[in-house]
């Protein structure tokens, strides 16, 4: 199941060539050895000055679930996720109260033959250029500091996704994900393991990025290992938050909120969350056939039953009137999340709006393509053609030029 790696990633940008994890799974090789054989040291990077994360206390959305004596939840997934949103917004607001300026620290030398941290960021940029072409193009309009930080986050998200969705996914165990999370803790505490971790460690020391969304994304990978069905949309929403909504929360501190924006910080975070959810719902609707061939159904079981459908109908891959009616409702829901996301994109800093608008406009067009395919997402994979991208991207750029609203009911 593909996940929305970043709320700024556009569809159809992932190369069909060599797997990303073929080149980074060991952490000390960045591309295949014939191209970059000895660029990176095998030594562990140790760097001081890292910040502590949540006073060493781990927290996950799952741990916030309140249960009755009968074991039933008393909070919806949206309520639980909103608690995380408030925490991320509070972190950014603390920085905004002190200064609106980004303090850029000098490059920190990395042991080994790589030399400078800036080279590690450059490697992250090469990955983005190879695997997310439209996204990488959009980042060129961002300030150098924000661009490098987004590259670093993109690479970490991609590595995390490849753990359960890459060629070695069958060998990944919960214990392996636990080790990956421990390594994440080291990154946030200034003890990166390799050059890619080093870029992320520097990023989180320069921007008010909290560790929680990263932990929650790993929790989403755990969910993929143990779960292949979702009883209702509440369960599916939580999964979408874990694997995609988290990326929006990671990205807002990097993208930045426009100084002239009158929107609340929470509303901007909610929009980022909504875009992640919308992108992931779109992935799910696009990949129904592909997921079914892997024995997975990422659709609410109760809604399938209400439509007179079952897993067997999905595995059979027949487009019926019942399926069309069901899909129309699912697409309508995804578009509602895109509509919610639009409310916050304009409030971002001017240099950061275009890649986000590009993601929103292009991903939403995938839903149009599903409709154009007569809802056959069993054997046809909806995608946005190059010609349609060329038409859509100028529209996204024009939208990015629109300044934040002049009035709002709440101040940041």
UniProtKB/Swiss-Prot annotation:
Which superkingdom is the protein from? Eukaryota
Q: Which GO terms describe its cellular component?
A: chloroplast
Which sequence ranges are marked TM in the entry?
Answer: none
Q: Which Gene Ontology BP terms does the record give? A: carotenoid biosynthetic process
Q: Name one GO molecular function term.
A: geranylgeranyl diphosphate synthase activity
SUPFAM superfamilies attached here? Terpenoid synthases
Transit peptide interval: 1-129
Kindly state which reaction or reactions the protein catalyses. 2 (2E,6E,10E)-geranylgeranyl diphosphate = 15-cis-phytoene + 2 diphosphate
Q: Which Gene3D superfamilies match?
A: Farnesyl Diphosphate Synthase (1.10.600.10)
Keywords from UniProt, A to Z, are:
Carotenoid biosynthesis, Chloroplast, Isoprene biosynthesis, Plastid, Transferase, Transit peptide
Q: In which pathway does it act?
A: Carotenoid biosynthesis; phytoene biosynthesis; all-trans-phytoene from geranylgeranyl diphosphate: step 1/1
Subcellular localization, as worded in the UniProt entry: Plastid, Chloroplast
Protein transport is among the record's keywords: no
Q: Does this UniProt record's set of keywords contain Plastid?
A: yes
Q: What does this protein do?
A: Catalyzes the reaction from prephytoene diphosphate to phytoene.
Assembly: Monomer. Interacts with SGR1.
- Which protein are we looking at? Phytoene synthase 1, chloroplastic
């Amino acid at each position: 199941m593909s996940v929305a790696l970043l709320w700024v990633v556009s569809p159809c940008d992932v190369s069909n060539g060599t797997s990303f994890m073929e080149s980074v799974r060991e952490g000390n090789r960045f591309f295949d050895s014939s191209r970059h054989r000895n660029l990176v040291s095998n030594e562990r990077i140790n760097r001081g000055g890292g910040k502590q994360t949540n006073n060493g206390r781990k927290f996950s959305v799952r741990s916030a679930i309140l249960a009755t004596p009968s074991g039933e939840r008393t909070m919806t997934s949206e309520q639980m996720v909103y608690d995380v949103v408030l925490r991320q917004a509070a972190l950014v607001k603390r920085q905004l109260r002190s200064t609106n300026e980004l303090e850029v620290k000098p490059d920190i030398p990395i042991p080994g033959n790589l030399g400078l941290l800036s080279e590690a960021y450059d490697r992250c940029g090469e990955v983005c250029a190879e695997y997310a072409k439209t996204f990488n193009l959009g980042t060129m309009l961002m300030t150098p500091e924000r661009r490098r930080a987004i590259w670093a986050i993109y690479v970490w998200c991609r590595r995390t996704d490849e753990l359960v969705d890459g060629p070695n996914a069958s060998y990944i165990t919960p214990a392996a994900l636990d080790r990956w999370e421990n390594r994440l803790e080291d990154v946030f505490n200034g003890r990166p393991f390799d050059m890619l971790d080093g870029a992320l460690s520097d990023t989180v020391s320069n921007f008010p990025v909290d560790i929680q969304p990263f932990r929650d994304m790993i929790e989403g990978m755990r969910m993929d290992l143990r779960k292949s069905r979702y009883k209702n949309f509440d369960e599916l929403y939580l999964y979408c938050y874990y694997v995609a909504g988290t990326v929006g929360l990671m990205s807002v501190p990097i993208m930045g909120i426009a100084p002239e924006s009158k929107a609340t910080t929470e509303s901007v975070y909610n929009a980022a969350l909504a875009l992640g959810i919308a992108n992931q719902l779109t992935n799910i609707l696009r990949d129904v056939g592909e997921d079914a061939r892997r024995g997975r159904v990422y659709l609410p079981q109760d809604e399938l039953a209400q439509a007179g459908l079952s897993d067997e109908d999905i595995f059979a891959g027949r487009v019926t009137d019942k399926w069309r009616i069901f899909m129309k409702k699912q697409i309508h829901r995804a578009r509602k999340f895109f509509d919610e996301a639009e409310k916050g994109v304009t409030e971002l800093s001017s240099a950061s709006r275009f890649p986000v608008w590009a993601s929103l406009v292009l991903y939403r067009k995938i839903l149009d393509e599903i409709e154009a395919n007569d809802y056959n997402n069993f054997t046809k994979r909806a995608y946005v053609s190059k010609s349609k991208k060329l038409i859509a991207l100028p529209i996204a750029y024009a939208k990015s030029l629109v300044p934040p609203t002049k009035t709002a009911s709440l101040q940041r």
